Amino acid sequence: MTKSKLQIFGQVFSLLILSLFISAIDSKGEENPTPAPEALPGGGEWPQWGRDASNNMMSPATGLPTDFTAGDLQGDGTAEGAKHLKWVAEMGSQAYGTATVKDGRVFIGTNNEKPRIASVTGDKGIIMCFDEKTGELLWQFDIPKLDAGKVSDWEFLGVCSSVIVDGKYGYVVTNRGEIICLDVYGMADGNDGPFQDEAKYASGGLEKLAQAEPVELDEKCADIVWGYDMRSELGVFPHNVTSSSVVISDKYVFASTSNGVDWSHINIPAPHSPSLIALDKETGELAGEEYSGISQSIMHCNWSSPAYSDNLAGKPTTVFGAGDGVTYGFHATEFDEEEDGGETYKLFKELWKVDCCPKEYRVDEAGEAIKYATYPGPSEIISSPVIYNNKVYAAIGQDPEHGEGVGAVTCIDPSRGTGEDAIVWQFKEVGRTISTPSLADGLLYIADYSGRLYCLDAETGEKYWEHDTLSHIWGSTLVVDGKVLLGNEDGEMVILKAGKEYEELTIVNYPAPIYATPIIANNTLYVMTQTHLYAYGFGE
């Protein structure tokens, strides 16, 4: 029985005393382990990046087979001979985010190089919504490209963010630097509003509604509820692409702005714009913004997806891995207020921060700054911070275009304070990574861009084993049913045994690279390659 239930039903004196005792321990910031999720045969839903607000890529599903196969793709869109396959859906030519599943719908981000709707042509960002049982395309959201080109919206990258679903609404960050709230039913149940300009949005996004020519809409089109343009409203400058998934609380949508450097990789066009913001979940209005100076110290960009906890070291906290290599904890419900020019600004309260980039990566023995984008140089945080057992785990890395280099995974205990005092351990054998750690049963699994997968003790950082996939890795690990699943650039889904003892179970080969993270929802394993989404049924 949890403490909240004790407060509601607390009629037994001894249990009330126990509850007060636990509260006293929590107030001192001592260990209060997160209970392991109960085993669910089908794993439940997967409604957001990281499955829940902790960003921990693990599933309580059981009975997952390891003999599933990709089969041979056919011209009619099927995969002949694929074992355990329920359906396969064709996407565009590139996909970097992760699928999400909620209430009978599957959401993915891709591009439009292989149009699913004949009237939608040209390079665009695309969100597709599929029927969970059949893989039928229910509707899609067409997002025009920015005029800025590759400096802020690289060709054919599509939408790199994952949709988070909350009831009737889905929230996503577009390739245009917008945060959009969508009706998960699309236009099938009408244009619900309050936004009514979907026909104009398709021509120029939120930025060009006034001059855009409307296009014809049908029931396969997306229904926008509200939208917030971070570029227009905040003056931010996304570098190459806007790439981050939002996290939500009961009131707010927290999102990275993807603010970064310009084409020179030296200048920061918007050093005073926020790197993290909060929007009102119902209206899309700006509710708060980061004011810690992150944008002044950006190495490349802010691409990490924030995490959220309603009680981390005794406070509701939004955790952000930033473009300066630092992990921040901000109060998630209280904001400072500052007036300037007759306007009142709500600013995030910084609770703590930890530099996750080791000093020896920033400065050499002679005291000289080490150049960025060199093998021994400093890195920002691109992977997502993970909250597990009242601690935060964060890993540094860079844009894969910069190649391989030194990395680090840092374990942070916010109850210890801020800065170096909050560091529990730091593991430096890992290389640069854009992969998010997964934690289960006291173990941490982390992959690096070089292709290696590490198993560490979550409490001490001790390494138990490592595995080399011999291929670059963009996605993250999924821990499920005593197994660790990990896709790589060679199109291999590597499956290892979870635990302290190393054992490779099998490798499943696909005809295209896997840059996304596999997920499990409702007795189904989803594997997303660059071009197709495979749905495998099990245990039904």
Name each region found by the language model.
Residues 1, 15, 49:
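Conserved S/T- and glycine-rich ATP-binding loop of Class I adenylate-forming
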Residues 11-21:
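Bacterial N-terminal signal peptides
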Residues 2-13:
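Bacterial N-terminal signal peptides that target proteins for export
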